[in-house]
């Protein structure tokens, strides 16, 4: 089983990203779970969402405390949240950032085995005209992890967002897929 934890801020689409990733894996014949963790969040407050993907039925119903993959939609969270808390040995961190590998590693409390970086915000601004990074970061997830194919991500995005909005979001995911840099540490 692969367990993914998303860290974002209210209004950035972390919950939608977790759901779209689950749908992409489902389209590939996997068993999936996706769910948010809500406190008294408001727009801009830290939000956590989760996705589980497996080849067999998933019976666990708890939050993900020891993720294989951590996805950070908002790089400012690296200063306030321990995004690597519980990260499994051999785990991966995927960050939306324009910073260098060294700058990001300085902010992580635990060094991951792999680090993937992409400037998902710039991609979202260029393609969507908004700094909503949830679909672009999924392109990075597809490239860095290989959990799902980028084509499945694009299809799941188009299932979630209709018409031109779906096409633009799928394009943002593809662009991030192509621009993501993965480091073995």
UniProtKB/Swiss-Prot annotation:
Its EC number is 1.2.7.1, 1.2.7.7. GO terms for molecular function: 3-methyl-2-oxobutanoate dehydrogenase (ferredoxin) activity; pyruvate synthase activity. It is an enzyme of class 1 (oxidoreductase). Keywords: Oxidoreductase. The keyword Oxidoreductase applies. It catalyses: 2 oxidized [2Fe-2S]-[ferredoxin] + pyruvate + CoA = 2 reduced [2Fe-2S]-[ferredoxin] + acetyl-CoA + CO2 + H(+); 3-methyl-2-oxobutanoate + 2 oxidized [2Fe-2S]-[ferredoxin] + CoA = 2-methylpropanoyl-CoA + 2 reduced [2Fe-2S]-[ferredoxin] + CO2 + H(+). SUPFAM superfamilies: Pyruvate-ferredoxin oxidoreductase, PFOR, domain III. Disulfide bonds: none annotated. InterPro entries: Oxidoreductase_gamma_subunit, PorC_KorC, Pyrv/ketoisovalerate_OxRed_cat, Pyrv_flavodox_OxRed_cen. Heterotetramer of one alpha, one beta, one delta and one gamma chain. PANTHER family: PYRUVATE SYNTHASE SUBUNIT PORC (PTHR43366:SF1). This is Pyruvate/ketoisovalerate oxidoreductases common subunit gamma.
